[in-house]
C-alpha cells in the first residue's frame, strides 16, 4: 500500500507546471494610506457571501464582489497576444472569467494599469459579444475577444477573454492588479465560454485535470500555483480528500467550527467555499459577531474589528472540521497586524440567508495554513498542512 501511495504522488507531480505568485501590499493599505478606506467601506459593504446570494437570485448576471480583494496579497503574471503583452492578475478560484483592461477603456481606473492593445497582436480575434461583470462597487463592461494566453510555459490558443471599456471607479484606481483570471467551474462565467484552466486540459497542455495552491505567509516570493500536478514537498503528511458538494464554486461540506472543544458556529454542518480570491474568513453575520465577541474583538466605525495585539499569544485555535478531519486556525492567522502595529480580526461578516444553509468562504487566511488541491477530474478538494 505504501508503494501505491508513493507511485500516486509521483504521478501527481509528473510534468506539473509551477507558476510563481508575487506577494504584494494589499489594496486596503493603499486605500488607508490615501485616506479613502472608510468612505469606500461605507459605500461598498459587500463581501463574497453577499454576491453568492445575488447570483442565486439572478443567475443570468455574472456578479463579482470587489471588497473581497481588499486584503489580497497574491498575484500572478500572464501574457496575452502575439507578441505577448504582460499583465498582473488575481488567480481566483471564486470566478471563472479572464479579463484585462483594453486601450479603449475610458475609465480613469484604466489609466493606472496596463492595457491590452489588439492592434499589436497578430493572433487577436474580436467576437463583438458584450461582456458585463457586476461588482459591488460598479460594473466592468467591455467586449469578448479571443487570443493566445500564456501562463508560465503553457500556451493556450484562441482563449476567450474580456476586454474592459469601463471599470468600477475608486476600487480599480487603487487596485494592485490589472485583471482577474478565474479558476472556478465554467458555469460561474459567461455562457458558452471555456475558461482558461479548462482549455489547458482540453488542449492537452497539462497531464492531470487539477491544480493546486501553496500560499506562503513569510516571503515576497515562494507562493505557487501548480498546474497539472502536485509537488508533495510543499505539504506535510497525506492529502485528505473532500468531495465538491456543488460544482460551481469550489464548495465543500464543513462539519463544524469550534474553539476550546465547544462548537461556536456551523452547528450541525454548513457549506464552505475554498476561495483564493478572498483574503479573510467570511461567514454569516450572526456567527461572525459571536466569534468576534469570543476573541474580544471590538467593532470600529468602518466595519473592521480590532484587538489588543498581545492576545495573539493567548487566544486559542479556532478549529474547522471538514470530512471528520480537524484544521486548526491559530490566533496568529486569524489576527493580522498592519504596518501601524494595529491588530485586526481576519473574520468578516457576510450575510444571513434564512432560505439557504449557513455559508462560509475560506480565503487566504485558511489557505496559507493548508496546501489545497483543486481536482476537476474527480470533483474533489485535497487538503494537507502546508510545509
Swiss-Prot record:
GO biological process: proteolysis
Disulfide bonds: 105-110, 266-270, 309-343
Compartments where found: Secreted
Assigned keywords, A-Z: Aspartyl protease, Disulfide bond, Hydrolase, Protease, Secreted, Signal, Zymogen
One GO cellular component term: extracellular region
This protein's record includes keyword Transmembrane helix: no
Ranges where the Peptidase A1 domain occurs: 74-384
Keyword match Signal: yes
Gene3D superfamilies according to UniProt: 6.10.140.60, Acid Proteases
Known regulation of activity: Inhibited by pepstatin A.
EC assignment: 3.4.23.1
Protein name, UniProt field: Pepsin A-5
Gene of this entry: Pga5
Amino acid at each position: 500500500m505504501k508503494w501505491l501511495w508513493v507511485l500516486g504522488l509521483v504521478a501527481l507531480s509528473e510534468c506539473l507546471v509551477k507558476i510563481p505568485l508575487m506577494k504584494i501590499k494589499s489594496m486596503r493599505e493603499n486605500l488607508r494610506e490615501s485616506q479613502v478606506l472608510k468612505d469606500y467601506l461605507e459605500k461598498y459593504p459587500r463581501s463574497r457571501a453577499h454576491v453568492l446570494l445575488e447570483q442565486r437570485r439572478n443567475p443570468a448576471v455574472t456578479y463579482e464582489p470587489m471588497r473581497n480583494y481588499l486584503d489580497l496579497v497574491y498575484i500572478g503574471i500572464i501574457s496575452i497576444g502575439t507578441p505577448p503583452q504582460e499583465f498582473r492578475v488575481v488567480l481566483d478560484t471564486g470566478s471563472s472569467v479572464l479579463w484585462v483592461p483594453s486601450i479603449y477603456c475610458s475609465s480613469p481606473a484604466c489609466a493606472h494599469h496596463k492595457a491590452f492593445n489588439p492592434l499589436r497582436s497578430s493572433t487577436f480575434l474580436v467576437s463583438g459579444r458584450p461582456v458585463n461583470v457586476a461588482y459591488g462597487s460598479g460594473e466592468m463592461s467591455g467586449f469578448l475577444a479571443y487570443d493566445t494566453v500564456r501562463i508560465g510555459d503553457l500556451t493556450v490558443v484562441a482563449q476567450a477573454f474580456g476586454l474592459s471599456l469601463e471599470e468600477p471607479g475608486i476600487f480599480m484606481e487603487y487596485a494592485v492588479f490589472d485583471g482577474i483570471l478565474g479558476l472556478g467551474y465554467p458555469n460561474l462565467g459567461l455562457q458558452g465560454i471555456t475558461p482558461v484552466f479548462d482549455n489547458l486540459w482540453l488542449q492537452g497542455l497539462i497531464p492531470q485535470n487539477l491544480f493546486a495552491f501553496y500560499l506562503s505567509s513569510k516571503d515576497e516570493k515562494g507562493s505557487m500555483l501548480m498546474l497539472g500536478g502536485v509537488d508533495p514537498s510543499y505539504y506535510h503528511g497525506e492529502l485528505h480528500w473532500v468531495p465538491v458538494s456543488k460544482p460551481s464554486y469550489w464548495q465543500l461540506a464543513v462539519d463544524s467550527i469550534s474553539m476550546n472543544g465547544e462548537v461556536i458556529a456551523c452547528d450541525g454542518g454548513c457549506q464552505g467555499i475554498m476561495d483564493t480570491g478572498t483574503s479573510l474568513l467570511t461567514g454569516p453575520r450572526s456567527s461572525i459577531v459571536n466569534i468576534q465577541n469570543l476573541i474580544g474583538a471590538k467593532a470600529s466605525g468602518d466595519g473592521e474589528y480590532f484587538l489588543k495585539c498581545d492576545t495573539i499569544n493567548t487566544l486559542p485555535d479556532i478549529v474547522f472540521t471538514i470530512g471528520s478531519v480537524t484544521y486548526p486556525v491559530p490566533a496568529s492567522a486569524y489576527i493580522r497586524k498592519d504596518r501601524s502595529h494595529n491588530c485586526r480580526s481576519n473574520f468578516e461578516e457576510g450575510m444571513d440567508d434564512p432560505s439557504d444553509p449557513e455559508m462560509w468562504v475560506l480565503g487566504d487566511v485558511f489557505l496559507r495554513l493548508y496546501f489545497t488541491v483543486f481536482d476537476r477530474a474527480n470533483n474533489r478538494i485535497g487538503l494537507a498542512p502546508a510545509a
